[in-house]
Amino acid sequence: MSISLLNKLSMNQFQKRIKQFSEERDWGQFHNPKDLLLGIVEEIGEIRNIVKWEQDIDKLRKVLNDNKEKLEDEIGDIYWFLALLANGSDINMDEAIDKVIIKNQSRFPVSDVKSQHTNLYLGGKDKQYQ
């Protein structure tokens, strides 16, 4: 399957492709939940390394833009590990995404949170904790 076709896959189709890729290489034996989670953390850490110590929002945006290819690669790796974790846990990523969207629409109604943060410790609103 070409890269251009991968861009048009649903998350569930992506999951199936990752599963096939892994099975062809007999890598399932290495894909325990702990190591998959550590893989996600590692990839997030690689993104963190791009922006660490910088506080200025404009500089942060610039460094991310200047390193867009690296950021894209790390985000792709995160999705890869998430697909492996979802496959091993029998979770359909399309369904999981739909559920979280529905949950967050109820949890954060536009009328309550538009242009407001949701950090309860700083006075934000979150219906889950009210």
Q: Which role fits each region the language model picked out?
A:
Residues M1-I75, Y79-Q130:
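Flexible "arm" and connector segments at domain edges
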